[in-house]
């Protein structure tokens, strides 16, 4: 099975400007992400950026680059531009990896592509089990609820499902007894290329605007998303300077 990885690499991050070029163990961060994508077995890896400096660095380490607009409001809009510019066939599987995930396990990149190929859906993703109450109640940890076959019922920053008997008078989140139903969504997606174009035809929905989760547009419009448990839990991504230092320490040991 062939699949293409697209890695968006925005230069103007509000919390960590220029992070695609941040040095980690002697390489720019975006090169680490690119190398992980190659290790997944992808037949093509494309880095999508809106910055000429990033594009020059990417070309220097031998990766394919696609220049995109600076005006996109979401990562999906950037993917759609790449798909259109490069005339990627509608049936091609596209895996979207964030450009700030230098520690992403290659095995889960392959897994999400396989997940899409196995099921009659246009979009697939992964999740991991939630093991502590702090993560469960953290709005930055997106929860996902599925049916018995792994098809998504809903994504939320709130706790879903809500355990009425346990949570109603909860005093200490550390004392929560967690059921297997509690899953944290991992922000890695696989799509059919043509579906990305279809997605762009739908107007933003109230649900996604409230939760700030663009994948809810897919559910709202009646499409299904399949989610599997990730074979490996990904390590920290890089959103802040503190995250960057953590990743540098991890890769310095390798």
Swiss-Prot record:
PANTHER family: 3-DEOXY-MANNO-OCTULOSONATE CYTIDYLYLTRANSFERASE, 3-DEOXY-MANNO-OCTULOSONATE CYTIDYLYLTRANSFERASE, MITOCHONDRIAL. GO terms for cellular component: cytosol. CDD domains: CMP-KDO-Synthetase. Its EC number is 2.7.7.38. GO terms for molecular function: 3-deoxy-manno-octulosonate cytidylyltransferase activity. One of its GO terms (biological process) is CMP-keto-3-deoxy-D-manno-octulosonic acid biosynthetic process. The gene is kdsB. Pathway: Nucleotide-sugar biosynthesis; CMP-3-deoxy-D-manno-octulosonate biosynthesis; CMP-3-deoxy-D-manno-octulosonate from 3-deoxy-D-manno-octulosonate and CTP: step 1/1; Bacterial outer membrane biogenesis; lipopolysaccharide biosynthesis. The keyword Transferase applies. Activates KDO (a required 8-carbon sugar) for incorporation into bacterial lipopolysaccharide in Gram-negative bacteria. InterPro entries: Cytidylyl_trans, KdsB, Nucleotide-diphossugar_trans. This is 3-deoxy-manno-octulosonate cytidylyltransferase. It comes from the Bacteria. Disulfide bonds: none annotated. Keywords: Cytoplasm, Lipopolysaccharide biosynthesis, Nucleotidyltransferase, Transferase. It is found in: Cytoplasm. It catalyses: 3-deoxy-alpha-D-manno-oct-2-ulosonate + CTP = CMP-3-deoxy-beta-D-manno-octulosonate + diphosphate. It holds the Pfam family CTP_transf_3. It comes from Haemophilus influenzae (strain PittGG). Coiled coil: none annotated. Belongs to the KdsB family.
């Amino acid at each position: 099975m062939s699949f293409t990885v697209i890695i968006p690499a925005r230069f103007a991050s509000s919390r960590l400007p220029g992070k695609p070029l941040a040095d980690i163990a002697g390489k720019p961060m975006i090169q680490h992400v690119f190398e992980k994508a190659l290790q997944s077995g992808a037949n093509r890896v494309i880095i999508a950026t809106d910055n000429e400096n990033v594009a020059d660095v990417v070309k220097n380490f031998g990766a394919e680059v696609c220049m995109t607009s600076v005006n996109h409001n979401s990562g999906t809009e950037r993917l759609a531009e790449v798909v259109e510019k490069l005339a990627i066939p509608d049936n091609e599987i596209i895996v979207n990896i964030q450009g700030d995930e230098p520690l992403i396990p290659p095995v889960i990149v392959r897994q999400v592509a396989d997940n899409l190929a196995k099921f009659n859906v246009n979009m697939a993703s992964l999740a991991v089990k939630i093991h502590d109450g702090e993560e469960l109640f953290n709005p930055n940890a997106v929860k996902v609820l599925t049916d018995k076959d792994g098809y998504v019922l809903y994504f939320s920053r709130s706790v879903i499902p809500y355990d009425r008997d346990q949570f109603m008078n909860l005093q200490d989140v550390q004392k929560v007894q967690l059921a297997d139903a509690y899953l944290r969504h991992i922000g890695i997606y696989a799509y059919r290329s043509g579906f990305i174009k279809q997605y762009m035809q739908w107007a933003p929905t109230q649900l996604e605007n409230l939760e700030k989760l663009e994948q809810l547009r897919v559910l709202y419009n009646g499409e299904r998303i399949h989610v599997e448990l990730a074979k490996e839990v990904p390590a920290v991504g890089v959103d802040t300077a503190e995250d960057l230092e953590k990743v540098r320490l991890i890769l310095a040991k390798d």
